[in-house]
Amino acid sequence: MSFASETKKELTHLEVKPCCLRAELSALLRMNGSLSFSGGRMAIDVQTENAAIARRIYTLLKKGYDVAVELFVRKKMRLKKNNVYIVRVTDGAASLLRELHIVNGDFSLIHDISPELVKKKCCKRSYLRGAFLAGGSVNNPETSSYHLEIFSLYEEHNRALCELMNSHFFLNAKTLERKKGFITYLKEAEKIAEFLNIIGAHQALLRFEDIRIVRDMRNSVNRLVNCETANLNKTIGAALRQVENIRYIDETIGLDSLPAKLREIAKLRIEHQDVTLKELGEMVAGGKISKSGINHRLRKIDEIAERLRAGKPVDFHKSL
């Protein structure tokens, strides 16, 4: 089961207060419901491929409203296709839609989120939970990028969802138009974690955070290893260059031509090619020399080698 499916399954087991029941159910019916007419009677059909969500809708309807509710399963004939679960409301469908602020008194569709539904903070949380159950998805935190989104057919409702998430919960949600509708989405791991907490998916939140911590630690270790590897490669490269330059000087004018201080460092570097500058400084006969002091002398040796390669004269009085 995917992380998104596990999260939704957890949400379908939450207990809700009567006021919150209405808010959650409004989002579920608004986003997954459709109207049908048979024999002059209107019915509401709510379709989902998730059995747990279908049971949730059925339970909320039976618990909160005096309406006739039926549950159907439509089996898809194609291979690897999930069943479709249909929750149908027949008697009382019109009054239910008005009660849930999905339609106005004249039966025109309300695309916005009615303030009556989300007066309390708990109801705001419940509406977002219903919206996520109806049209939400969230990436597995082990994947390359963090992403949570809620899909809506209508732009106005999508904007209202984004506004609810940002103005009351400061989630920094953004909206985007898709081919068949609109999405409100989150990309920041911290905000996704906050959203899971807001809608009551606490087990999913704990799993998300556990995976995120391990992932962030792994990334930090990788960055540290990469940095240390780069520094090591740089150090090895510098040592090889120094040895090459010292050997070139030895072959052209001889190391004995170098001033005593440079000659001593040159011989030490040839003898100890794999040691650090600090370790090299501790080998000097006259006493310990700092890392910067050793680096200065080696740079002077590099300059002498470059001048010799270029056929330029070398003034050893300026080489210290």
From Swiss-Prot:
Residue spans binding DNA: 276-310
**Taxonomically, which superkingdom?**
Bacteria
Query: In UniProt terms, what function does this protein have?
Result: Involved in cell division and chromosome segregation.
The answer to whether keyword Cell cycle applies is: yes
Q: Transmembrane residues, as ranges?
A: none
List, in alphabetical order, the Gene Ontology terms for molecular function in this entry: DNA binding
Please tell me whether the keyword DNA-binding is annotated for this protein. yes
Name of the protein described by the UniProt record? Probable cell division protein WhiA
Family annotation (HAMAP family): HTH_type_WhiA (MF_01420)
Q: Which family does the similarity line name?
A: Belongs to the WhiA family.
Lineage of producing organism: Bacteria, Bacillati, Bacillota, Bacilli, Bacillales
Provide this UniProt record's keywords sorted from A to Z: Cell cycle, Cell division, DNA-binding
**Species of provenance:** Geobacillus kaustophilus (strain HTA426)
